[in-house]
Amino acid sequence: MVNQELLNPKTITIIGASNDTGKPGGNMLKNILAGGFSGIIYAVNPKEKKVQGITSFAEVKDIPQTDLAIIAIPAKYCPETIKNLAEEKNTKAFIIISAGFGEAGEQGKQWEQEIITSINSVNGCLIGPNCIGAITESYKGVFTAPVPQFNPKGCDLISGSGATAVFIMEAGMALGVSFANVFSVGNAAQTGVEDILEYMDENFNAEKDPLVKLLYLETISNPQKLLKHASSLIKKGAKIAAIKAGSTAEGSRAATSHTGAIASSDMTVRALFNKAGIVYCSSREELLSVASIFNYRKLEGKNIAIITHAGGSAVMLADELSKGGLKVPEISGLDAEKLKTFLYPGSSVANPIDFLATGTAEQLGIIIDYCEHKFDNIDAMAVVFGSPGLFDVENVYNVLSVKLEICNKPIFPVLPSVVNAQREIQSFLKKGHINFPDEVVLGKALSQVFKTPEPISEEISLPKIDVKKIRSVIDMVTEGYLDAEQTEKLLDAARIPRVTELVENSKEKLLTAIDSLKFPVVMKVVGPLHKSDAKGVVLNITSKEEVSETFDRLMQIDSATAVMVQPQLAGLELFVGVMKEPGFNHTILCGLGGIFIEVLNDVSAGLSPISKNEAQQMVQSLRGYKLIQGARGQKGVDENQFVEIIQRLSALVEAAPEITEMDINPLIGTQKNIVAVDARVRVG
């Protein structure tokens, strides 16, 4: 859908252009003129013969042919205007900044559809409606401010919200972040974030194109396209960070009223981002911090040296790095002692390296050199240096600027004195560097970048399962929850181990069969979906008499059809499950069972199909992972078996895409084996 008429037009016509730069059509023209567009510009305004020095036409029928039309007129006039442009003026690219379309109601949706039909009939491209426009190397087609200078090595920004794009650019420019192509897709009636990413991927040149891509999404209309092209770009050398808004019911409602978006589960989105290699961000501040990190050398290890003259900042940064899985290793030995001789008395080199409020530019340079060349246990440096009010810090920032250029290890500058050292910071930014004004924000962003996995590059191989048997079960069901027998057949076909059990609706038969099990046992009602809520689970049954009494009680529960008896197993409770969001592949979940999932929500997710590496990452990212390994004298579980079960569950839903929900909770795990104790499956 993206075409050269959009990216590099020879002629641009602004319909609704104005001499009043307080109006969108007026400021749009002003920005294009000021941006140095080298082609021909036409204006359409029935009341003016000249608009900002440009010849103005009264009607669209009067203009010459035009590559790109930018529309800034009321929504009700857009369908006919665009039809004329497409059919009579050979226009192939359209930007509609007007609002009042799909986000406003049924009439707006109808206008939107008429517009799409006209544009598609000429294989054209539409950005919008309800957007701020676009910036390319050719033109500055936005009606807002600020308008960043195009930097071919800056960040590409693709946003589902025009205002958010403005806020990101405004805040980014203050930090030293530069921008290249900017696309505000608005309602994305024809061209969405995924489509622009597709074009960037298919035409990517790692030597010439911007490497950093920033996304703000309110809807993911084509998850598979996003996954395919984001992961492809990252494999080619690009770096992508994204915000996905509308992940709660409240956020979804706000997104719906804004652009007609439908929110998807935050957990599913995170799983998609992880599979693609996209860094997940939850705010503009975090997005820009990640973008800033992308603009520095890649962090190859987790060991960070904190270099500062501010002890409190160092403590906060060390805490944040540690919480995020990075390390601030102790620095010691002969080289550390030698470094100390260059610093003032009272300085510390243990890490954080604190060279006091009186520390000099020369001392900073020496410290960085030692971290670069002498301290092999250091992978990167964070330099926190503000203005203590004792001296001009420009020399300090000059040294930092030089070291940023020549050091192989990444250096992340935190220059917090945005008032005291405003002039010096601006001088630093003009040299092409980026500032992190807050050390905690840097710590969070560094951790987020470091723990984001590389995109899945392997051909995913899933365990062998009995697909024929799975289909024989699924094909007999239309929708709803499977019964116990059907669920057991699916588990067996997927070769997911399950506990031995008896299911009977006759007490006499159950009492006869119970001899095959060892006490203690667990008895569960069959029929009600939520057994615990129905008080249909009884533990620690140690005799036939208790079996008889419990059977009678359980069969009195509403909708009870039978009673299930299982051995009462000892071990660590685990959980695996499946959920399916519209448009997405199945999301596979894993975690610890019991309180860990119910109260602490300690769950990790991956998008099916799940590779072995992905399954391992899912397990190891759990907050309760130490319990899986074994902690405080408690024996752990067989991690390899847990990983295999996650993969087998993925194989099951790949064979049975009709499954919409599934959970196995709990699995009971020991060092020797892991078995499913309870499961439920929903299709439809």
Question: Where are the predicted features?
Answer:
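Catalytic-core regions of core metabolic enzymes
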Residues: M1-G684
